[in-house]
Amino acid sequence: MKKSYWISLYLKVENQDNLKKYAEVVTPIIKSFGGVPLVRGGKFETLEGETYPRTVIWEFPSHEQAMKCHDSKEYQDGWALAKDTTERNLQIIEGFSTE
């Protein structure tokens, strides 16, 4: 089974406190669907294209699990804490097998 990756590119964060509350609430929810955090902010360099002030990447055991997590009521309730003061692009991308 191929893993899938949840990639959030934040375009604008108007309220850091709301984003922090969102992260605190949704982290255990995402983990309950098998999500593993790979990138959460941190030092970065923009070498080409647009700069995003924050990037978050989660790894999931499958595309289906990533979608179930995103579509769950629990996650959507958590996202409601930040969505009015945050603008982001979110993609769920299936990885490839190296075997």
Positions of the model-derived regions?
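Short S/T/G/P-rich N-terminal loop/turn motif that feeds into the first structured element of a domain
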Residues: M1-R54, P61-D71, E94-E99
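C-terminal structural segments of small proteins and small subunits
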Residues: M67-C69, E74-Q91
